Amino acid sequence: MVIDMYPAHILESGEIQTVREHCRSTAELAARALRPIGLTQSAYLAGLLHDLGKCKEEFRQYLEAAARGDEAIRGSVNHTFAAVRYILEHWHHSGGEFDDSDVTAELLAFASGAHHGLFDCIGVHQDSGFFHRQTKEGIGYEESVQNHLKECVDAATLDSLFQQSVREISAVIERITQLTAQESDEEANREITFHIGLLARLLLSAVIEGDRRD
């Protein structure tokens, strides 16, 4: 079911902020935050997708119930998994050589999917936090994607933004690699992995800043 203007927030005054308004504003604020270090498009894309999972009737009903003062358990309607699944299904390779596009997809999936709480990409038992989010049922994924692409941004624009993000992330990885050029392979790999972890937190921080400020 496709209905225009899905709500992202309903204020105490009754004013509605739509998912389109909120995602675009969050994206702009996140992009502005990371513009000085050349990650504008990466931050923009993560912000644009972070609330993809709100574009469904179940979330509309949840927000409207809360606005009326009805009993509505905060966080009871999952909206954070959808962006992770979309990003990984469309831009992450399921097999073969792991390259910068895969790194970019995982960074964006984490930044968009962890804006309400961190999750382990790899758990203590080697389980994947990404896989859990990709395979979770009953979250209205197809409905959310259909409505988000109609209301917020089309698929071709998302694909273009992702390719620009890959170029940005590749440039950062190249700079990190240059900094470790004098290290042994083992030490260099450790340093690169550490700095990519910092990059993940930086992108997430930009999305959270945009989300909270908007």
Where on the chain are the PLM-derived regions?
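Accessory nucleic-acid engagement/destabilization modules that flank
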Residues: V2-D214
